[in-house]
Regions:
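Bacterial N-terminal signal peptides that target proteins for export
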Residues: 1-9
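N-terminal acidic, glycine/proline-rich low-complexity segments
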Residues: 24-207
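Sec/Tat signal peptide C-region and signal peptidase I cleavage site
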Residues: 20-22
């Protein structure tokens, strides 16, 4: 019960921190959503319900965040549940059913181009979110950071940092952070120290 409460507090705190950060931005940037990536070791409800609860909580606030990726990865203390990406799809199926009612909050009638920058109040299509739901690292520990350990998740993180977008990318770590660590390793190998520094400056990590 304490862990479930802690995870809920983390999600709420993330909402408050990002909201405050964007409240201090210049007016022309104020209407754009903050960009977020979720790394989750989501598990069945009978094993660890807090991850699914956090996913549902995030989706009912999807009009406040530009969800760049939902990445299924390992936990920090076990081999993880990267193969349970289907649980994220279950949450998205529920989101799809509720979406018509959720859109009424902002009188939204249609969906914008999925690749366009999203304004606060915009509800993303379930197709957009499904395309952004991918696998990250499947193995835990530093010995699995390096050659042969790139994943769809780590590659997407790199591509997002390369996009022409001044907004920082918030990485919310609900499980292990190895997918992000692998992205850092890859950039470190392939780019100059200055380019690595520029890459790292794009991110804000919240665990």
């Amino acid at each position: 019960m304490r862990k479930i409460k802690t995870k809920s507090i983390v999600v709420i705190a993330l909402i408050l921190i990002i909201t405050q950060a964007y409240a201090n931005k210049e007016p022309e940037q104020k209407d754009l959503k903050p960009r977020i990536v979720v790394l989750t070791d989501i598990a069945p409800n009978d094993i660890e319900p807090d991850d699914m609860e956090s996913m549902i909580r995030l989706l009912v606030h999807a009009d406040q965040f530009e969800i760049e990726a939902l990445i299924a990865t390992t936990g920090w203390s076990n081999t993880g549940n990267g193969e349970r990406i289907d649980l994220i799809y279950d949450a998205l199926n529920a989101y799809e059913k509720d979406l018509p009612n959720l859109m009424k909050r902002s009188n939204q009638k249609k969906f914008a181009n999925d690749e366009s920058k999203q304004e606060i109040g915009y509800w993303p299509s379930v197709n957009y979110l499904r395309l952004r739901t991918i696998l990250g690292s499947k193995n835990m520990g530093m010995k699995f950071i390096g050659d042969g350990n790139d994943s769809d998740g780590s590659n997407l993180i790199i591509r997002m940092a390369d996009e022409n977008d001044e907004r920082p990318i918030w990485i919310s770590v609900w499980g292990g952070g190895n997918t992000f660590a692998q992205a850092i390793w890859r950039v470190q190998q392939d780019r100059s120290p200055e380019e690595l520094k520029a890459f790292l400056s794009k991110f804000r990590i919240y665990t």
